[in-house]
């Protein structure tokens, strides 16, 4: 079982990294992709990935931090991305929900990271919120030049997921799908995602599955809860949990080049 989205650099994990990783392993999560969202956190994620076996990382700048993009940051991300633990560029994309960075800053950072991924022949770890059309417009010209892409934490519509699938994207599903208030539409479109394009993630410490029992007192999500998401998704798709686990592990190997069975 592989969690493609763990924010282990979050301050919520600052006191118990070792315990979080140990609990994940005990739960059967044998691999994790640690997300980089700006230069310092990308550097920290790479250090953590080199410290913990079965962990890899991304290197990039989240749209919220698009204003931080500069030639110096680009050079540092380029250098970091060549470390063996780094297997994707990102988290990059567009987020027009709150615009912590202006749309123009976000678009510049996103386009630059797509160019970087093409130059390095690396897949991209993508973020899109309230920006679907513009996101795809910027992404499309690069898709033939990069080896693959996953739209992480997908929460969009049926038409949006179909557009992404038509472009060859992998789709990342989180515990959002376990939310009986906000996740029902996503739950209904799960069968529309081909098994060979599906990836699973917790996005920990965020998006604790609402139907998890018992719920942790901290309300903090952890990669140890990925088996709950896996079992839920398999049930709603009408598939055996063990089969879907093997398929999503194979998808990780396909997209990121990670030897999942060697972990």
From Swiss-Prot:
Predominant location: cytoplasm
Stored PROSITE patterns: TATD_2, TATD_3
Keyword terms: Cytoplasm, Exonuclease, Hydrolase, Magnesium, Metal-binding, Nuclease
GO cellular component, one term: cytosol
Cofactor dependency: Mg(2+)
Signal peptide bounds: none
Location(s), subcellular: Cytoplasm
Superkingdom per UniProt: Bacteria
Sample GO molecular function, one term: single-stranded DNA 3'-5' DNA exonuclease activity
Binding-site residues for a divalent metal cation, renumbered to this chain: 91, 127, 152
EC number assigned by the record: 3.1.11.-, 3.1.13.-
Enzyme's top EC category: hydrolase
Family per similarity comment: Belongs to the metallo-dependent hydrolases superfamily. TatD-type hydrolase family. TatD subfamily.
Subunit text: Monomer.
HAMAP family per UniProt: TatD_exonuclease
Function recorded in the entry: 3'-5' exonuclease that prefers single-stranded DNA and RNA. May play a role in the H(2)O(2)-induced DNA damage repair.
Protein name as it appears in the record: 3'-5' ssDNA/RNA exonuclease TatD
């Amino acid at each position: 079982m592989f969690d493609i989205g763990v924010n282990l650099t979050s301050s919520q994990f600052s006191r118990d990294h070792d315990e979080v990783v140990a609990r994940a392993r005990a739960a059967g999560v044998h691999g994790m992709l640690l997300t980089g969202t700006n230069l310092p956190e990308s550097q920290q994620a790479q250090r953590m990935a080199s410290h913990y076996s079965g962990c890899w990382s991304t290197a990039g700048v989240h749209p919220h931090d698009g204003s931080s993009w500069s030639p110096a940051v680009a050079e540092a991300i380029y250098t970091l991305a060549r470390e063996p633990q780094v297997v994707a560029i990102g988290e990059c994309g567009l987020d027009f929900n709150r615009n912590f960075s202006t749309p123009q800053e976000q678009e510049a950072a996103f386009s630059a990271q797509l160019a970087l991924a093409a130059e390095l022949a690396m897949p991209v770890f993508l973020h899109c919120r309230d920006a679907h059309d513009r996101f795809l417009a910027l992404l499309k010209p690069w898709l033939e030049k990069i080896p693959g892409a996953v739209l992480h934490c997908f929460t969009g519509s049926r038409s949006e997921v179909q557009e992404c699938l038509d472009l060859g994207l992998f789709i990342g599903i989180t515990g959002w799908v376990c939310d009986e208030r906000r996740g029902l539409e996503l739950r209904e479109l799960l069968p529309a995602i081909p098994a060979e394009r599906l990836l699973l993630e917790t996005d920990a410490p965020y998006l604790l599955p609402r139907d998890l029992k018992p719920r942790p007192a901290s309300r903090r999500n952890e990669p140890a809860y990925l088996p709950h998401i896996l079992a839920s998704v398999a049930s709603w798709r009408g598939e055996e949990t063990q089969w879907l686990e093997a398929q999503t592990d194979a998808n990780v190997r396909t997209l990121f080049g990670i030897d999942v069975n060697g972990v």
